[in-house]
A protein has these predicted regions:
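Conserved SGNH/GDSL esterase-like catalytic core that processes O-acyl groups on lipids
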Residues: 68-229
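Bacterial Sec-dependent N-terminal signal peptides
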Residues: 19-50, 406-409
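Bacterial N-terminal signal peptides that target proteins for export
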Residues: 2-12
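A short helix->loop->beta-strand "cap" motif at the edges of active sites that frequently abuts
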Residues: 236-240
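Histidine-centered active-site loop/cap adjacent to the catalytic His
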Residues: 80-84, 370-409
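Mobile gating loops/cap/lid regions near enzyme active sites that modulate substrate access
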Residues: 255-327, 331-383
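Catalytic nucleophile-elbow at a beta strand-turn-alpha helix junction centered on a G-D-S/GDSL motif
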Residues: 53-69
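Bacterial N-terminal signal peptides
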Residues: 11-20
Length: 409
């Protein structure tokens, strides 16, 4: 028996004919009933639970849940993939690291954490790691969250506990909290047989530029080839995915400020033993505040000139440097978004957090408050706080909802 479907304004199926139809066997066949509007969100949530039934994350410190240059269970639970899974109501295993963590997250104020000097631009966690606590009891590896602090795309594809041990015992310890021997993020992801994968693997290719070493960024073509190999592995699983892009403008980064803003704080800086040259007022340069300010504090009495030494780790960026960084991020974002569209995957960018308006710059707040870079950024000036991670989780949910027609709260 055939049903003929019309498209009434309410958008549900309508049958031509009577409210019930008698089949050739004499049975009464009831027509399909429209879905009540109040039931549709529940059905969409059920669909999202199917989509994300086995949700696996590839990524960097932003996905792992690093806060204040350390990773521990509280930050891991707050990471945007974990928040996304919780909103969708799906299981999501996290390789939770016991207190005090790997490295123990720094405690405020920023002024007391001169240990950060020289660590910026690389993996903050392993750079200052003093201890790496074991996992909480009962956790089986690999878990759903495979993201590792400091990972570049090439690390996700190639790096194992064993390969990292040849470079850094600290990094090997961190990898051992996430992966089994011989595994990479990508091989562990494939082994998990995911239904959905998040891929956030672009930030660490650009991060060295925050110190002023713009030439230390990973070349776009090198990153692209590795990134595409990772996406091919994701595609091979048949899973859905959300790809994560970079911020749009490095100058909007919460811990990057104009030299003139820095100059305007000269009375407070002078009280700390830092004289600020008038050159800062006239300069068009930008300063990566955590590194620049902590370095000055370690040398007091001293004078800040806001001058740039090309490709030196001086935490000074010229306007030209910002343009170069933004050009690379734009190229990477365009490629990530293109690959997402080609594969029918969702896409959002870290711009949802890092391009938000910044709070007013006050050196006293930066050095001595609990939130030196605003409520959304942790003490290190780089990684999201729990509130910042919630912003990313919302951006991810909106992107997935739009692409897959589901309703993740």
């Amino acid at each position: 028996m055939k049903y003929f479907v019309t498209r009434p304004g309410l958008g549900f199926l309508a049958l031509v004919g009577a409210a019930s139809v008698v089949s050739s066997c004499g049975e009464i066949v009831q027509p399909p009933r429209p879905i009540a509007p109040e039931q549709r969100p529940l059905l969409n949530l059920a669909t999202s639970q199917s989509l994300l039934a086995r949700f696996v994350s590839l990524g960097t410190s932003n996905s792992q849940g690093v806060q204040s240059a350390g990773v521990a269970a509280a930050g891991q639970r707050a990471a945007w993939p974990a928040q996304l899974a919780q909103r969708a109501g799906v299981p999501y295993d996290i390789p939770l690291i016991q207190i005090p963590g790997c490295n123990p997250p720094l405690i405020p104020p920023l002024a007391a954490n001169l240990v950060l000097i020289g660590a910026f631009g690389d993996d903050l966690v392993s750079a200052i790691m003093t201890t790496c606590a074991p996992l909480e009891p009962g956790i089986a590896l690999p878990a759903s969250n495979l993201a590792i602090s400091g990972a570049k795309a090439r690390d996700a594809l190639h790096s194992t506990i064993e390969s990292e041990a040849l470079v850094s015992a600290r990094k090997a310890e961190l990898y051992a909290r996430v992966l089994l021997p011989g595994q990479t993020q990508v091989t562990a992801m494939v082994a998990k047989q995911p239904t959905f994968v998040s891929v956030e693997l672009a930030a660490n290719e650009v991060l060295p530029a925050s110190t002023g070493r713009v030439a230390a960024m990973t070349p776009f073509t090198e990153w692209r080839a590795t990134y595409d190999a990772i996406l091919n592995a994701v595609k091979g699983t048949g899973a859905g995915a959300v790809l994560v892009g970079l911020p749009n403008n490095a100058a909007n980064f919460p811990s990057i400020r104009r030299a003139r803003e820095f100059y305007n704080q000269w009375p407070y800086l002078l009280a700390l033993g830092i004289s600020v040259s008038s050159k800062c007022y006239l300069s068009s340069n930008y300063l990566f505040i955590p590194g620049y300010l902590l370095t000055l504090l370690s040398k007091t009495p001293t004078t800040a000139t806001c001058a740039d030494v090309p490709d030196a780790a001086d935490y000074v960026l010229t306007a030209g440097d910002i343009t170069v960084i933004n050009s690379q991020m734009a190229a990477m974002n365009a490629h990530i978004q293109t690959r997402a569209n080609e594969n029918g995957w969702a896409y959002f960018s870290l711009s949802a957090l890092y391009d938000l308006p910044k709070p007013a710059f006050r050196v006293v707040d930066v050095l001595f408050s609990n939130t030196p870079f605003g409520a959304n950024i942790s003490l290190d000036g780089v990684h999201p706080s729990a509130a910042g991670q919630a912003i990313l989780a919302t951006a991810a949910a909106q992107a997935i909802n739009a692409k897959y027609g589901v309703t993740i709260p």
